[in-house]
Amino acid sequence: MVNSLTTPEPQTLKPGVKAPVQETLLTPRFYTTDFDAVANLDISANETEIRAIVEELRADYNRHHFVRDEEFKQSWDHITGEKRRAFIDFLERSCTSEFSGFLLFKELSRRIKSRNPLLAEAFEFMARDEARHAGFLNKSMSDLNLSLDLNYLTKNRTYTFFPPEWVIYTVYLSEKIGYWRYILVHQHMQEHPEYQFYPLFRKFESWCQDENRHGDFFKALLRSQPQLWKNWKARLWVRFFLLTVFVTHTMTVFERASFYESIGIHPRKYNNRVIQETNNTSARAFPLILNTNHPLFFWRLEQCWENNFKLAAIKNSKLPNFVKFFQRIPPATAIFWNMLRLFLIKPIDTEATRGTVL
């Protein structure tokens, strides 16, 4: 049994327009970066592969796939209660994440166009895909009588600065983990069509193909920059980003456990499989991957969630703030301790077998 939070009732900015979810460590974030540094990236070490992927992006294989067919044109009022709230929450967070990618890629494309046209073109194509996804998700929300004001989000969301190196690490992992999230839900729906309560799920196969291509681009970009994988500092950063992405994913899945249960997916099994597959896929890009077979690996990930669950309960309590401060210390310390122990698990060297991995 997974401890999970009850999905709150949606709040609105005005009739039919949902108020954005409160920003936390688990909500999708908006990013900016050093555009000059990206423009000056030397990609010659892997330019052939990058050009090949840009041509795939140009082909836009999914341009006709995201069409709202007749199946969407009906009332969805029969989706009620926690199932409806959890589905709206899933749509909102997914839409916000895709829109965040669109804004970052679009700005990258605009800022570097004159100095690095090949990368600018790639970012333009990926921005196209992210905008298509975000629009489709937002339209799905409108079927449930709500939608996001994306212009409001653009102007009012907090933007987090990441240097280009961090952007490459995190976006690569985000796209690849997104691929595995979507493809596993798609495969589950193929085997259990009785859980397919909304036609959006039929689009997940095409969706995951876009995520995979974006991940392939960032993998090629990463491998063109030896400083991102060919020294001890890079190895430490890779371990850090793999770990933080997997901890965040675990917390997010368990937080939304009611949504996954509503579509017949066991949250723990789903989370573990997504992490294992993403970790294995990352061997194609990174000099190392985490040892997910360690007997305490997933237990410690779940301890991070259990203590985050305690932090949420403390935050929502009506106790005085000074009492909450002291109550937060043990679970916050436990999260840090479990993450440290996970970080110290000996990783798996992938460069030693690079010829067989690629």
Swiss-Prot record:
- CDD domains the UniProt entry points to: ACSF
**Which GO BP terms sit in this record?**
light-independent chlorophyll biosynthetic process; photosynthesis
Enzyme class label? oxidoreductase
The terms under GO molecular function for this entry are: iron ion binding; magnesium-protoporphyrin IX monomethyl ester (oxidative) cyclase activity
Which reaction does this chain catalyze? Answer: Mg-protoporphyrin IX 13-monomethyl ester + 3 NADPH + 3 O2 + 2 H(+) = 3,8-divinyl protochlorophyllide a + 3 NADP(+) + 5 H2O
Q: What is its EC number?
A: 1.14.13.81
Cofactor field: Fe cation
Name the UniProt key words of this record, in alphabetical order.
Chlorophyll biosynthesis, Iron, Metal-binding, NADP, Oxidoreductase, Photosynthesis
Q: Which domain of life is it from?
A: Bacteria
What does the record give as its pathway?
Porphyrin-containing compound metabolism; chlorophyll biosynthesis (light-independent)
Identify the SUPFAM superfamilies for this entry.
Ferritin-like
Q: Pfam families this protein is in?
A: Rubrerythrin
* Coiled-coil region(s): none
Task: Name the family the entry cites.
Answer: Belongs to the AcsF family.
Function recorded in the entry: Catalyzes the formation of the isocyclic ring in chlorophyll biosynthesis. Mediates the cyclase reaction, which results in the formation of divinylprotochlorophyllide (Pchlide) characteristic of all chlorophylls from magnesium-protoporphyrin IX 13-monomethyl ester (MgPMME).
Q: Which NCBIfam families match?
A: AcsF (TIGR02029), PRK13654.1 (NF010172)
UniProt protein name: Magnesium-protoporphyrin IX monomethyl ester [oxidative] cyclase 2
Q: Which organism is it from?
A: Nostoc sp. (strain PCC 7120 / SAG 25.82 / UTEX 2576)
State the gene name recorded for this protein. acsF2
